[in-house]
Amino acid sequence: MSHYKENKLFQFLLSQFGEDESLRLMKLYRVGTANHWQGSTVFWQTDIQGKVRTSKIMLYNPANGRRIKEPHNHITWVHSLIHKDGFTLKQCFFGEHLLAKDSTKSVAIVESEKSALIASSYLPQYLWIASGGKNGCFREENLSVLKGRNVVLFPDLGATDDWAARISTMQRMGITVKLFDYLEKNATPEQRKNGFDIADFILEVKRPQTILQGMIAKNPSLNLLIKELGLVLIEEPVHPVSTVKRRGFKL
């Protein structure tokens, strides 16, 4: 779980969150780097008991965080590359190992591993895990780790009805479930065409740190100045009763 500087997904996260937060997210979710494709990302599936089940390898565009799908879809599995004799695939949620660290926090489920990382930073009140696809990890043996938990489903656009159909099974298993369908009800045609998910919507709402990282990318010397002077990004109301924010730095 190193060589992050060569990792294309890490490079994208760096542009959004800065180095400290990007490193925290990669280590928290045990994300690695592969040389199958230069700078590709390894998403290890580690279960609630800390056992590695398998891992998915994908290649991302560092400029926009999208998966590389041309001239072919850059996605594969570690178990398919090593050809281990007698191996039986038994997947689990990406990020499932985090369930053992906090038994009280509400759990949010998304499709994409990348989206789990991004949403975890912006909405830390949830414990974010990923199913790995529209139909991934919804068998009862996968869902059993969520028994007794409060769960919110965040389907990609176009998958809301499919995920809504899973709710009755989950409730029968003792899982308290809510469906976040705001995106499905309010998305634009362009967003639907691009298959937006919660992380895509989150990234459209630029927070101060993201804006700062964009400034640093254009002028790297700004980062040196910030570190040299010990500047800290602030965001505070201009007036106690105003919702307008003033952004800047403090020493």
How would you label these PLM feature ranges?
Residues 1-53, 99-101, 214-251:
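TOPRIM metal-binding catalytic domain and adjacent DNA-binding surface shared by DnaG-type primases
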Residues 10, 22, 70, 80, ...:
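Short linear sequence motifs
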Residues 2, 108, 159:
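Charged, low-complexity surface patches
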Residues 14-15, 85-97, 186-196:
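Short, exposed beta-strand "edge-strand" segments with a Pro/Gly-rich flavor and a Y/T-containing core
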Residues 104-105, 116-251:
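TOPRIM fold recognition
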Residues 34, 63-68, 185-192:
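Low-complexity, polar-biased intrinsically disordered regions enriched in Pro/Ser/Thr/Gly
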Residues 36, 42-147:
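Phosphate-handling DNA/RNA-contact segment within nucleic-acid enzymes
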